[in-house]
Amino acid sequence: LIPMLYAIYIKADIKNTFSLRLPKLRYILGGFIVWFGGYFIINITTRILISLFPEGADVLEAVNSSVMMDSFFASLIVVALIPAICEEILFRGFLLGAFKGESKKSKIWAVVMVGILFGIMHLNFIRIVPTAILGILFAYCALATKSIWTSVFMHFLNNGFSVCALYITQKYLRIAIDTNVTYTMPPISSILV
Protein backbone atom coordinates (compact mmCIF):
# COMPACT_ATOMS: atom_id res chain seq x y z
CA LEU A 1 0.00 0.00 0.00
CA ILE A 2 2.78 2.47 0.89
CA PRO A 3 4.59 2.02 -2.45
CA MET A 4 1.30 2.61 -4.29
CA LEU A 5 0.54 5.73 -2.25
CA TYR A 6 4.05 7.05 -2.82
CA ALA A 7 3.78 6.41 -6.56
CA ILE A 8 0.48 8.30 -6.63
CA TYR A 9 2.06 11.11 -4.59
CA ILE A 10 4.95 11.53 -7.06
CA LYS A 11 2.46 11.23 -9.94
CA ALA A 12 4.13 8.15 -11.40
CA ASP A 13 2.45 6.08 -14.09
CA ILE A 14 1.04 3.31 -11.86
CA LYS A 15 0.62 0.72 -14.63
CA ASN A 16 4.21 1.12 -15.85
CA THR A 17 5.82 1.72 -12.44
CA PHE A 18 4.39 -1.49 -11.04
CA SER A 19 4.34 -3.48 -14.30
CA LEU A 20 0.63 -4.21 -13.93
CA ARG A 21 0.09 -5.56 -17.45
CA LEU A 22 -1.59 -8.93 -17.64
CA PRO A 23 0.91 -11.53 -18.85
CA LYS A 24 0.28 -13.99 -21.64
CA LEU A 25 -0.55 -17.54 -20.56
CA ARG A 26 2.80 -18.80 -21.85
CA TYR A 27 4.56 -16.40 -19.44
CA ILE A 28 2.58 -17.83 -16.53
CA LEU A 29 3.54 -21.35 -17.65
CA GLY A 30 7.15 -20.21 -18.00
CA GLY A 31 6.96 -18.76 -14.49
CA PHE A 32 5.77 -22.14 -13.23
CA ILE A 33 8.73 -23.88 -14.90
CA VAL A 34 11.20 -21.34 -13.48
CA TRP A 35 9.66 -21.69 -10.00
CA PHE A 36 9.72 -25.50 -10.22
CA GLY A 37 13.41 -25.51 -11.14
CA GLY A 38 14.18 -22.84 -8.57
CA TYR A 39 12.34 -24.78 -5.89
CA PHE A 40 14.95 -27.52 -6.03
CA ILE A 41 17.78 -24.99 -5.85
CA ILE A 42 16.33 -23.25 -2.80
CA ASN A 43 15.50 -26.57 -1.14
CA ILE A 44 19.08 -27.81 -1.60
CA THR A 45 20.45 -24.46 -0.42
CA THR A 46 18.22 -24.57 2.68
CA ARG A 47 19.31 -28.11 3.50
CA ILE A 48 22.99 -27.17 3.13
CA LEU A 49 22.55 -24.15 5.40
CA ILE A 50 20.68 -26.23 7.98
CA SER A 51 23.45 -28.85 7.94
CA LEU A 52 26.05 -26.11 8.46
CA PHE A 53 24.00 -24.26 11.07
CA PRO A 54 21.72 -26.85 12.73
CA GLU A 55 20.51 -24.38 15.36
CA GLY A 56 18.90 -22.42 12.51
CA ALA A 57 16.51 -25.31 11.86
CA ASP A 58 14.79 -24.75 15.21
CA VAL A 59 14.36 -21.05 14.49
CA LEU A 60 13.09 -21.82 10.99
CA GLU A 61 10.59 -24.34 12.35
CA ALA A 62 9.40 -21.86 14.99
CA VAL A 63 8.90 -19.15 12.36
CA ASN A 64 7.00 -21.55 10.10
CA SER A 65 4.77 -22.70 12.96
CA SER A 66 4.08 -19.16 14.12
CA VAL A 67 2.61 -18.07 10.77
CA MET A 68 0.35 -21.09 10.37
CA MET A 69 -3.26 -20.98 11.52
CA ASP A 70 -5.78 -23.68 12.36
CA SER A 71 -7.68 -23.04 9.14
CA PHE A 72 -5.96 -24.18 5.96
CA PHE A 73 -7.71 -21.50 3.89
CA ALA A 74 -6.89 -18.73 6.37
CA SER A 75 -3.23 -19.81 6.25
CA LEU A 76 -3.35 -19.86 2.46
CA ILE A 77 -4.65 -16.29 2.41
CA VAL A 78 -2.31 -14.94 5.12
CA VAL A 79 0.85 -16.85 4.15
CA ALA A 80 0.45 -17.17 0.37
CA LEU A 81 -2.01 -14.71 -1.18
CA ILE A 82 -1.41 -11.50 0.79
CA PRO A 83 2.42 -11.72 0.72
CA ALA A 84 2.36 -12.65 -2.97
CA ILE A 85 0.48 -9.46 -3.80
CA CYS A 86 1.99 -7.04 -1.27
CA GLU A 87 5.62 -8.17 -1.49
CA GLU A 88 5.52 -8.32 -5.28
CA ILE A 89 4.09 -4.79 -5.50
CA LEU A 90 6.93 -3.56 -3.28
CA PHE A 91 9.86 -5.60 -4.60
CA ARG A 92 9.13 -6.52 -8.22
CA GLY A 93 6.89 -3.53 -8.82
CA PHE A 94 8.20 -0.47 -7.02
CA LEU A 95 11.85 -1.32 -6.25
CA LEU A 96 12.60 -3.17 -9.48
CA GLY A 97 10.99 -0.32 -11.40
CA ALA A 98 13.08 2.21 -9.47
CA PHE A 99 16.40 0.35 -9.83
CA LYS A 100 16.27 -0.82 -13.43
CA GLY A 101 17.69 1.40 -16.09
CA GLU A 102 17.67 1.02 -19.83
CA SER A 103 20.94 -0.88 -20.16
CA LYS A 104 21.20 -4.65 -19.83
CA LYS A 105 23.79 -4.25 -17.07
CA SER A 106 21.54 -1.99 -14.98
CA LYS A 107 18.66 -4.46 -15.36
CA ILE A 108 20.86 -7.34 -14.18
CA TRP A 109 21.97 -5.30 -11.16
CA ALA A 110 18.36 -4.36 -10.43
CA VAL A 111 17.27 -8.02 -10.51
CA VAL A 112 20.12 -9.05 -8.19
CA MET A 113 19.66 -6.11 -5.78
CA VAL A 114 15.90 -6.60 -5.50
CA GLY A 115 16.46 -10.32 -4.91
CA ILE A 116 19.01 -9.66 -2.17
CA LEU A 117 16.77 -7.08 -0.49
CA PHE A 118 13.91 -9.58 -0.65
CA GLY A 119 16.09 -12.17 1.09
CA ILE A 120 17.25 -9.73 3.76
CA MET A 121 13.67 -8.66 4.44
CA HIS A 122 12.89 -12.21 5.59
CA LEU A 123 15.40 -11.68 8.46
CA ASN A 124 16.10 -15.29 9.43
CA PHE A 125 19.72 -16.18 8.58
CA ILE A 126 18.80 -19.61 7.18
CA ARG A 127 16.16 -18.04 4.92
CA ILE A 128 18.15 -15.08 3.56
CA VAL A 129 20.11 -16.93 0.85
CA PRO A 130 17.30 -19.20 -0.44
CA THR A 131 14.82 -16.33 -0.35
CA ALA A 132 17.26 -14.06 -2.18
CA ILE A 133 17.60 -16.72 -4.89
CA LEU A 134 13.83 -16.90 -5.10
CA GLY A 135 13.65 -13.10 -5.20
CA ILE A 136 16.11 -13.03 -8.10
CA LEU A 137 14.00 -15.57 -10.00
CA PHE A 138 10.83 -13.57 -9.31
CA ALA A 139 12.51 -10.32 -10.40
CA TYR A 140 13.89 -11.90 -13.57
CA CYS A 141 10.46 -13.22 -14.54
CA ALA A 142 8.73 -9.92 -13.73
CA LEU A 143 11.28 -8.06 -15.86
CA ALA A 144 11.25 -10.58 -18.71
CA THR A 145 7.44 -10.67 -18.91
CA LYS A 146 6.99 -6.95 -18.11
CA SER A 147 4.37 -7.99 -15.55
CA ILE A 148 4.47 -8.49 -11.80
CA TRP A 149 1.51 -10.85 -12.16
CA THR A 150 3.95 -13.55 -13.27
CA SER A 151 5.96 -13.12 -10.08
CA VAL A 152 2.76 -12.81 -8.00
CA PHE A 153 1.73 -16.20 -9.40
CA MET A 154 5.16 -17.70 -8.67
CA HIS A 155 5.21 -16.24 -5.15
CA PHE A 156 1.70 -17.54 -4.41
CA LEU A 157 2.65 -20.94 -5.82
CA ASN A 158 5.77 -21.10 -3.66
CA ASN A 159 4.12 -20.04 -0.41
CA GLY A 160 0.95 -22.00 -1.19
CA PHE A 161 2.98 -25.15 -1.78
CA SER A 162 4.69 -24.59 1.57
CA VAL A 163 1.34 -24.15 3.34
CA CYS A 164 0.12 -27.40 1.77
CA ALA A 165 3.33 -29.20 2.76
CA LEU A 166 3.06 -27.96 6.34
CA TYR A 167 -0.56 -29.05 6.64
CA ILE A 168 0.21 -32.48 5.18
CA THR A 169 3.18 -32.84 7.53
CA GLN A 170 1.07 -31.84 10.53
CA LYS A 171 -1.68 -34.26 9.50
CA TYR A 172 0.75 -37.18 9.26
CA LEU A 173 2.41 -36.20 12.52
CA ARG A 174 -1.00 -36.15 14.25
CA ILE A 175 -1.80 -39.58 12.77
CA ALA A 176 1.57 -40.89 13.95
CA ILE A 177 1.00 -39.56 17.48
CA ASP A 178 -2.61 -40.78 17.64
CA THR A 179 -1.76 -44.29 16.38
CA ASN A 180 1.67 -44.52 18.05
CA VAL A 181 3.29 -45.18 14.66
CA THR A 182 6.58 -43.62 13.66
CA TYR A 183 6.83 -42.05 10.20
CA THR A 184 10.09 -40.91 8.74
CA MET A 185 9.38 -37.63 7.01
CA PRO A 186 11.79 -35.04 5.66
CA PRO A 187 11.57 -31.54 7.14
CA ILE A 188 9.04 -30.42 4.53
CA SER A 189 8.18 -27.35 6.53
CA SER A 190 11.77 -26.11 6.13
CA ILE A 191 10.89 -24.98 2.62
CA LEU A 192 8.52 -22.20 3.72
CA VAL A 193 10.13 -19.19 2.15
Regions found by a protein language model. Give the residues of each.
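Membrane-interface helix caps and helix-loop-helix hairpins in membrane proteins
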Residues: 120-126
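Hydrophobic residues within alpha-helical transmembrane segments
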Residues: 33-34, 82, 113-117, 129, ...
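Alpha-helical transmembrane segments in multi-pass membrane proteins
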Residues: 1-9, 30
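C-terminal membrane module of polytopic membrane proteins
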Residues: 156-193
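Membrane-embedded alpha-helical segments of multi-pass membrane proteins
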Residues: 1, 77, 129-137, 157, ...
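Juxtamembrane helix-loop-helix connectors linking adjacent transmembrane helices
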Residues: 15-86, 176-182
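Membrane-interface helix/loop boundary segments of multi-pass membrane proteins
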Residues: 86-113, 140-147
